[in-house]
Amino acid sequence: MTEPTYIPLRLHTEFSITDGMVRIKKLIAKAQEYGLPALGISDLMNEFGLVKFYKACRSAGIKPIGAADVRIGNPDAPDKPFRAMLIIRNDAGYLRLSELLTAAYVGKDRNVHHAELNPEWLENGDNSGLICLSGAHYGEVGVNLLNGNEDAARTAALKYAAWFPDAFYMELQRLPERPEWEACVSGSVKLAEELGLPVVATHPTQFMSRDDFNAHEARVCIAGGWVLTDKKRPRDFTPGQFFIPPETMAERFADLPEALENTVEIAKRCNLHITLGKNFLPLFPTPDGLSLDDYLIKLSNEGLQERMVQLYPDEAERAAKMPEYQERLDFELNIIIQMKFPGYFLIVQDFINWAKTHGCPVGPGRGSGAGSLVAYSLKITDLDPLKYALLFERFLNPERVSMPDFDVDFCQSNRGRVIEYVREKYGAEAVSQIVTFGTMSSKAVIRDVGRVLELPFMLCDKLSKLIPLEANKPLSLEKAMETEPQIQELIEAEEADELITLAKKLEDLTRGLGMHAGGVLIAPGKISDYSPVYQADESASPVSMYDKGDVEDVGLVKFDFLGLRNLTIIEMAQNNIKNTTGDIIDVGKIPLDDQVAYQIFRDANTTAVFQFESTGMKKMLKTAHTTKFEELIAFVSLYRPGPMDNIPDFVARMKGQEFQYIHPLLEGILAPTYGIMVYQEQVMQAAQIIGGYSLGGADLLRRAMGKKKPEEMVKHREIFAEGAAKQGISREKSDEIFNYMEKFAGYGFNKSHAAAYALISYQTAWLKAHYPAEFMAATMSSELDNTDQLKHFYDDCRANGIEFLPPDINESDYRFTPYPDMKIRYALGAIKGTGEAAVESITAARQSGGKFTGLLDFCERVGKEHMNRRTLEALIRGGAFDSIEPNRAMLLANIDLAMDNADQKAANANQGGLFDMMEDAIEPVRLIDAPMWSESEKLAEEKTVIGFYLSGHPFGPYAQEVRQIAPTKLDRLKPQDSVRLAGFVTAVRTMMGKRGKIAFVSLEDLSGQVEIMVGGQTLENCADCLKADQVLIIESKVSRDDYGGGDGLRILANQVMTLQTARERYARSLSLALAPHHDIGGLVRLLAAHQLPDTPRIPLQLSYANEKASGRLQVPPKWTVTPSSALFGELETLLGSRSVRVNW
């Protein structure tokens, strides 16, 4: 093999985030094409891609060289740090670079404005494992050379040479587009000769080919928030910064062959080694010098004794059951110790039990871990695995060595406290969370590139929305253009070729950094000994620079601390119950056979019930009539694509339909699911019973079936048949059973996970059944910012007889508050425009000074720090001041006056003396008067901040009237050929169907809401009247819809009318209710104007009421009016909608 002439060392991959678009896979392929024996990457201030690069190089037979392009602090110009490249020579260098990068992001003396290395760290630390390149024209030497300051350049070179003895190289770069760099090259060569330093040639690679330059510029603009045409934006890169072949470098540095030779020399000096596949658990302290094994055995046996007392209070029954449990416990402990995982179990039980004893609710289990009796004994999980036939081997298989993985659900609001406990126990440097990489999906990249190209938002938005989804993920641009012809048509029509060209090059490129939802790393020392650590800013949590897959590869153990909203709801509900009733409820101790709770499921009254909220699940529950916990476990497992097909058979068999087991030997394991294979554990047990597999071997079979590898399946089929033959089962029957298992293994669910989640489902249903107001108040408090969900829960509460009390500055808190007798006080925090700090300032003022007496008093006592004009407006519009002043319009008109008055009083109070004596003499502030809003105005304003109508409903004033011609309430609909419906339109959306345009109209009355489809000629006839915030009368056909949402009804409009049109057509008379404040003269003039000749006219009926009496007025026969939209609109404006009624 010929000696290489050049090894690339300086290269930014896509993991430089703000620039660089080299994808590692393509880089390795091109390096192989160039015949490179070694290759380096040097991302900017990070090692995000190092492990991926290392593994890819090793697989391709290329020597990996790890490095980082680092910023180094510049005391003379802090906003212009110098650059250098630090290359890993050996294990010590790997640790040192990791330490330096970590310090740049999380160190106590880091630069908080941008990540950089403090020169003192380099001066005072051991850099012997690193090689340093000077940074060419961006380095301290190069910057001084280009500025003509040779003395400073010399001083800098000597400094770096001292920091990196025999490992500092003067870096040389040449680009045809950058002739100004040549001064740095010549100066560096001269200085190197003078000081006896080596030189090395690098090429600053940013992308793979020359035609990637424009895409790279777009990438830089996306990261920096610029547009491509911005003349002021940085232009740091050139088209020549692509991955060039060694021959090009040989030509460029023909006059300096030693600079090329030194790239090879550096490659030889560097031996990066990353240990992969070995796990490093933190050290768990044990008492009394016990080994980890002995301490696990001790805690497990003690925990089992405690659990057995809970499970079997009767001593005789407990004694009878104990041998079975003890045998299972000993079996599990032997495997855990054999696989060297006692430390893992001890660590997990420690932070879970800390959480449970410190007010941090923990879920009963999640994933396959609920199948472990050791976990149950240690209180890691809260479900008896023997009772529900949960298998330990599904969690930890001695025949397939891999780390156990407990997924632990914590209450969302307390999860951070548990992580903080772990930090304190093991040391902050030993704990971090895990980075995730956000990429530019096809939908996102269209919007991003469109922005930097300054294309119309509507065009990019439309293109993005045209990209179809597959399994909830957008298709690639290539596939989307093949699938959706409109994309290509739009590109051609709008001349958007450049958008697509750039977007394709950037698609799926790493765009940003995030944090893994639950993963927490605990290392047996500093995290940075295994992975550098990154922190976005002061408020963020530290994360590893390696993502989930990479940290596991380097041996760090991930512990999943997941936040589950429903645990927060349960905790809040239990607190609510204690506050309203005094009852102390622990959902972990409620009986699992309470038929009051199961009635919630039988009635499909499962809004807010964990895992059972969807329309499809409710439809299934209505037919199922469930009575026991095992059925809930099955429903959690069945209601997913694939298994859903078995729901009808499952429900029918639940109700008594006869069925046969596929083989009598399987009756024991299939009886709980009525002969249907639902769980992965059943597949494993069937393999054990029929095929003679161990449960560990059965787990391997299950995995093989799930992966559908033909060669493995052939092998397993024979093993299974041999085992079946020993049971006297024919090959034909054996193959039938195997095929049946194979079918279910593909989508069978993990029973351990289903059982744990079914338990939370049951607990939430139990709370809803026994303490509905307390539970729903907690549920709504968990969704304060989600208006759609709040409306959904509000409707459910009303359907269950819960009354809502309005928001009130003198009664409400930040969250929803339950009251006795099925009442909930609306939360101030659910009003848009408020916030927790603002509401806390209200409640604090209320607690210290009593109830507020008016707007002036409120503004004087609540600090301006959290109570700005926008928040005050929101509270008024939402009705929170109604108890002290119902005129919301007047309050809004006086906000500035009230806030100014509060400021003046505060200023006077600070002055003291004279102002104290004058306080009583100051004339009281007079509020500006303003007419009250009409009911419709009040509701419209209220909806802007509540998100829906709370104090009333805009349909209310019309309900009595329209029921004369549309008597059917929306919650009483049933399939029928023709029905006339009436309601208030809350939303209209349109879409293109197979037969043309379709509109979906959301219609509400006082009983409920439906969605009505309007299409074809009906849509053409009424397109102008399909608008939100008005009453419509709709002739409809109602049919059963087994596939749609709602209550399984499909409503199709045949005719649509506005209320005004319906009045014109069908009105028989007009009733007006008059009061003293009405303008009678104006009314007479209005009515006279609508006595149109030669038109159909209707008679008037007048009534009058004041404080003392009421009565009907005799109206002369000549007073008839022409019914019209104009008349009704003018009357409602003059008298109010409640005073105008049409009789049909």
Swiss-Prot record:
The family database entries (Gene3D superfamilies) matched by this protein are listed as: 1.10.150.870, Bacterial DNA polymerase III alpha subunit, thumb domain, Metal-dependent hydrolases, Nucleic acid-binding proteins
Family recorded in the similarity comment = Belongs to the DNA polymerase type-C family. DnaE subfamily.
Q: Catalyzes what?
A: DNA(n) + a 2'-deoxyribonucleoside 5'-triphosphate = DNA(n+1) + diphosphate
Subunit and partners:
DNA polymerase III contains a core (composed of alpha, epsilon and theta chains) that associates with a tau subunit. This core dimerizes to form the PolIII' complex. PolIII' associates with the gamma complex (composed of gamma, delta, delta', psi and chi chains) and with the beta chain to form the complete DNA polymerase III complex.
Q: Which top-rank group of organisms is this from?
A: Bacteria
InterPro entries for this protein: DNA_pol3_alpha_NTPase_dom, DNA_pol3_alpha_thumb_dom, DNA_pol3_finger, DNA_pol_IIIA_C, DnaE2/DnaE/PolC, DNAPol_HHH, NA-bd_OB-fold, NA-bd_OB_tRNA
Give EC number(s), comma-separated: 2.7.7.7
Designated name of the protein: DNA polymerase III subunit alpha
Keywords attached to this Swiss-Prot or TrEMBL record, sorted alphabetically, are: Cytoplasm, DNA replication, DNA-directed DNA polymerase, Nucleotidyltransferase, Transferase
Q: Does the keyword Zinc apply?
A: no
MF annotations from Gene Ontology: 3'-5' exonuclease activity; DNA-directed DNA polymerase activity; nucleic acid binding
